[in-house]
């Protein structure tokens, strides 16, 4: 946790200061974008500001006519482009076959994982020292979940974390579930 705070102080704070300085300098030049002229593109994580004609004229007057205002145009991504980008990032995941099940699932079953009745999934309840340790455990797992784009079904109550793993895209267990379960075991063992 301390590492995260230090990282935030050293990385985020200077960048926020740069943004604040940029905003202050644009205000001094008479550039005041209005809400109606501000457009954002969440998919590209960029902010485009289009100044009104009155704001551009005020900037030219304030700088003696030498203000060179640029308009930034974001081309919105179409659904097809977004799908193509996602498809490139995702690897094809397939359901475990019988040989892979026997080979990869058995060590997890020996470690306390159980098969869920009525669906192709595995379940385990992790009992940790207290809520802070349970939350740290979930945070560590969430980092991998985001990285591999595979999120567990879980429930937390004080020091207990119930986890169910299954891959919805293939309708059952996949190598992603095995990887996630192994990571859960490793993370839980580190916290003991």
From Swiss-Prot:
Membrane in keyword set: no
Origin: domain of life: Eukaryota
Top EC group: lyase
InterPro entries named among the record's database cross-references: PCD_sf, Pterin_deHydtase
The protein's Enzyme Commission number: 4.2.1.96
GO cellular-component term (any): mitochondrion
Any one GO molecular function term: 4-alpha-hydroxytetrahydrobiopterin dehydratase activity
BP GO terms, sorted: tetrahydrobiopterin biosynthetic process
Signal peptide: none
Any matching Pfam family: Pterin_4a
Keywords: Lyase
Reaction(s) catalysed (UniProt annotation): (4aS,6R)-4a-hydroxy-L-erythro-5,6,7,8-tetrahydrobiopterin = (6R)-L-erythro-6,7-dihydrobiopterin + H2O
HAMAP family: Pterin_4_alpha
PANTHER family: PTERIN-4-ALPHA-CARBINOLAMINE DEHYDRATASE
NCBIfam families xrefs: PRK00823.1-3 (NF002018)
Family: Belongs to the pterin-4-alpha-carbinolamine dehydratase family.
Protein name, per record: Pterin-4-alpha-carbinolamine dehydratase
Organism: Drosophila melanogaster (Fruit fly)
């Amino acid at each position: 946790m301390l590492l995260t705070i230090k990282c935030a102080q050293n990385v985020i704070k200077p960048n926020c200061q740069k943004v604040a300085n940029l905003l202050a300098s644009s205000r001094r030049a008479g550039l005041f974008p209005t809400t109606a002229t501000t457009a954002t593109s969440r998919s590209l994580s960029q902010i485009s500001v289009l100044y009104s004609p009155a704001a551009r004229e005020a900037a030219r007057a304030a700088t003696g006519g030498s203000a060179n205002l640029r308009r930034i145009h974001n081309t919105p991504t179409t659904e097809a482009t977004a799908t193509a980008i996602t498809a490139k990032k995702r690897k094809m995941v397939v359901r475990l076959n019988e040989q892979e099940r026997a080979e990869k699932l058995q060590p997890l079953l020996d470690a306390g994982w159980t098969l869920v009745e009525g669906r192709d999934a595995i379940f385990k309840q992790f009992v940790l020292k207290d809520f802070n340790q349970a939350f740290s455990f979930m945070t560590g797992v969430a980092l991998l979940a985001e990285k591999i784009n595979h999120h567990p079904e879980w429930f937390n109550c004080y020091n207990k974390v119930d986890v169910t793993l299954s891959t919805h895209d293939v309708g059952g267990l996949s190598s992603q579930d095995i990887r996630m379960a192994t990571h859960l075991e490793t993370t839980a063992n580190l916290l003991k």
